[in-house]
Amino acid sequence: MQITEALISEPGDIRRFIQQAVDHWPHLLAFYFTLHSAEGNINGQQIHAFCTSFYRQVHERITERNHTASPSSPVVLRWLREQHRGATIRCLLLFSQELFCHPRASVTVDEECSQVVDLLQQSWQVISAGGQCRVEKRFQVARGDTSGQYVALKTVALSLGLPVVTAIIYRPVQRCTLITAQ
């Protein structure tokens, strides 16, 4: 798994990060949520462990589904979160809707989104005993949509306290070497 992080403090950079996600995925799902710690300030190690744990759970779930149903694209998660180290941190998680809601699956978007919320909450409970992960809003944005959900998503992203940390988490493609007998 590879994590690429950047600290950004300009509203234009935040808009660009959101636009890149919308441009990358034809159907984007985003979750705006708040992490609360009952143990005091949330530190960088806890956030890293949370993101890693969530990614692993998603990857395992998708790998399992790929064996029983239609394959999905590689797991890529984009995160946007406040940098400050308080007991509460607001976050955005962005990913392809097809990652969870495969067009040929019989499960609805609402059912799959409910499972995403459960995974977020379970991941945070492991990291912060007694803490809470409260999902505030879900966004569904189609590529080319410049109103409604897209505007609401950008507004929420821009409401995060500056500077913010962006992260992209993915598993690099493993290259295979073909060896031929001489």
Where in this protein do the model-derived segments appear?
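Catalytic "initiation/cleavage/transfer" segments centered on a nucleophilic residue
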Residues: 1-25, 97-182
